[in-house]
């Protein structure tokens, strides 16, 4: 089009002059048609100046130069005596850009693509570029199977040579795959091969991955999957000969045919490594060992290459090249693998930098590093630093970037890019419950206090049965070696009878201090001392309580009792989770225990063990299986029993969902005469008149507990990728029990269950939603108990909520 205009302009110029071949001297230059473009700008873009002698070639160059500015739709150059007359038609200016009918592509993405092509508000409109954009968008829709889609650019003229640009989309429907055929397969059935595809011609209801909607990109991925399937089973000569994609006449159905040549199976005859091994030939040789007669496997070859790169990366060779060349012997059906290695230069770390830590101090991040500045670059050390930052729980994401230092052949900077999350929470609540009455709760918890890494918490609860307050502080780096120091003080006034537990009141206060000693990257030992004062009152006779009082030398009808205990607290934590919150891979084991020491009124020990294992079942870690267990056991020492107020409890959102908190397990069996006061309005149970006691629904807990949970974590529907790291959905199956190993069935009426039996397992199943919301960690769960016992109390819907800054 431009050349046609150039030719017309040249002809006009030739016809306007009588001596074009000899040229003429330009005395003046005039423009016609300029509106937005200044005369000076137009003159600067021209190769001709006043006083120049010009000919036909100069005029052609002038026209080309003016078109090249992108400001003009049409250019003509005429001669009027010695004056050069330039007639132009400016391209219109885009006043606005709107979209209509686009559902698959967001407006923001369209604007970005248009701007990349130079189409934006305030710029001139190039109709040729617009045609290319229309075609490109239609090609995109074709690639995702929408072959009836169309995109039209509607240009509406406005005053002052401006236009409104509107892109009108008719997306149509996605073509569905009617049939997938594989031609040339003999070793494996078509059904077996297609079962590994994302694209399917039939998708059962339970298959959440398969898709009948055609997408060019998915087909390319499926073809690569097909290639890998054969190469991993020894078919070294496998080849995809051709692929045909055919449309039905109505463009709503697609037939896919893949033509392949399987070839024969080949076995590896050996691996030969050569090149610059940087002195690590022995270690590399271990990575290339093969079993005699092993089938050729493409995935194993790729893994071997990656393992060699990782090995060299640990020794500072940041950019090694590893290339494998298979030598195929068709005569004996073997493959000899020749591996060429070039370790390259060894790199050293000049600086370690952190980006994105607006709250956390650099020192908090730097102390987690295992890579040192000035040392050679160790890829494993850099990765360890990333893992440790993730496990802090301060960040949503942690990424690393190794940047070469300009002008240096062997230096790099390591950059950790973090995205901080809200680590502090303030929660305040006012509620009313049938058991608790009016309830007030407030708390402040900051796991990264002022960016120092300190964990500080202040919590309090006030309701009809409890007044509780606690202050806790932990310094994770009390020493430079990573020894942590934590402590807390607390006060608790607890009236168990109003909480649907056995009848007693306990006013307690205490303090403890704990040191944590890191053993290695994943293991920490803890040791500390604690003190607690318990003052019990309003105790009503029940069998478990009677046993404890008698072991302490008190009579069964004692209604008040006080005890001061000093404890040695200990623990062990193994943590190999991939991050501190919403993990998707790895395991965590936490063992805690305490035992009373001389000077204590009570003599007992108590141990609990928590485990959690996350197993991703896809490469993106969006589908994860979680297994959790919790075990607890305690008992008395020196002929004494463990205090009943130290018992284990189960039920609620942290143990067995679907049951009310702390209601699973043994129930109180009250002795004769309990609550016979006619003025006592406690109606948890009828007045007991049996000499041997009577049962109730008041939970007393037990000295042994076992809880297990199996959870299937799935992508949350309708949540964009931006918020995927803040929301988690899961389906779960919980089970658990609490029992009393010291229970004597002969001490209770015949209608009371045997509370020493660990087989009374409760079970429930349901769905949970967790959200790191602006209000703090928020957890919803709905569970249905499907195995329960008399006295158990169901609570299907449960949630926790707080507020975060």
Swiss-Prot record:
Residues annotated as signal peptide: 1-20
GO CC terms in record: Bam protein complex
Compartment(s): Cell outer membrane
Principal subcellular localisation of the protein: membrane
InterPro entries, per database record: Bac_surfAg_D15, BamA/TamA_POTRA, D15-like, OM_assembly_BamA, POTRA
Domain POTRA: 24-91, 92-172, 175-263, 266-344, 347-421
Highest taxon listed in the record's lineage: Bacteria
Record's keyword annotation contains Secreted: no
Keyword Lipoprotein attributed: no
Keywords noted in UniProt: Cell outer membrane, Membrane, Repeat, Signal, Transmembrane, Transmembrane beta strand
PANTHER family in the cross-refs: OUTER MEMBRANE PROTEIN ASSEMBLY FACTOR BAMA, SORTING AND ASSEMBLY MACHINERY SAMM50 PROTEIN FAMILY MEMBER
Functional note: Part of the outer membrane protein assembly complex, which is involved in assembly and insertion of beta-barrel proteins into the outer membrane. Constitutes, with BamD, the core component of the assembly machinery.
Name the UniProt record assigns to this protein: Outer membrane protein assembly factor BamA
Origin species: Salmonella paratyphi C (strain RKS4594)
